[in-house]
Amino acid sequence: MLTFHELIGFMSPKMANQILDDTQANNREVYRALVASIAQAQKMRPLFIGRQPKERRHKNFVQMLSRAGSEEHAGNLIRGWLFKEHKDVLTEFLGKLGIEHEEGMVDELPESIDDGPLNEAVDLLLEKYDRELVAVYLTAFNASNENRWENLDTMLADDERLQLHG
């Protein structure tokens, strides 16, 4: 039952840096918005933050995004990264569950999902993709879902394969 800012705090530094690196390289609009919001929160100019060495800047971003007040920015960053860099994970999960989507975009999710199909879909993702990526995706998916699926929350809390060890 992690929120987006908690997810940033619990993921490995390697994963957090990968998200920021990919976003900086491939989703400049989201990255610029992030720089502007961090600058405003720290009462600095965006130009000053942009001139910091990337390693230091990204470390500061992770610290800021891990705070409760950064939920919206953390959510935008993670969702944007998943849609831009890992659409295949989204489409495979939704497809395995039989949920209609358009390239990972869903108009309406079911209020709940049966355990059997959910377990099969999660097992499929874990067979094909990095364990931490799957945990980040499933956590983000449920955090974005208006009707959180209780069985997915339980699985994220109890299944050792889906634990974040940041």
Regions found by a protein language model. Give the residues of each.
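Short acidic DE-rich linear segments
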Residues: 160-166
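Charged, amphipathic alpha-helical stretches
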Residues: 2-33
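Short, aromatic- and cysteine-enriched interfacial helices/patches
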Residues: 4-11, 47-48, 97-99, 162
